């Protein structure tokens, strides 16, 4: 454990951020899986699911959860075929 007061605060803040990022990543993974399943099964609402997943990936990039290349790769995978 940290000895400095500001570092003790940072430990708590980092833990909150870690949990929030973990939840957001899980939400994105679920959206991507749903979109890819909809594309392979040729569902009627596949465009809506793909748009939602791409939107979440963009938000993750904006928040700094994803790096540029990963976001581009995921978006490309969602948009292809």
Swiss-Prot record:
UniProt name for this protein: Small ribosomal subunit protein bS20
GO MF: small ribosomal subunit rRNA binding; structural constituent of ribosome
Family of the protein in this entry: Belongs to the bacterial ribosomal protein bS20 family.
Keyword check for RNA-binding: yes
Organism: Mycoplasma mycoides subsp. mycoides SC (strain CCUG 32753 / NCTC 10114 / PG1)
Gene this chain is encoded by: rpsT
One matching Pfam family: Ribosomal_S20p
InterPro entries reported for this sequence: Ribosomal_bS20, Ribosomal_bS20_sf
NCBIfam families found in the cross-reference section: S20 (TIGR00029)
Keywords in alphabetical order: Ribonucleoprotein, Ribosomal protein, RNA-binding, rRNA-binding
Superkingdom of origin organism: Bacteria
Function: Binds directly to 16S ribosomal RNA.
GO CC annotation: cytosol; small ribosomal subunit
A single GO BP: translation
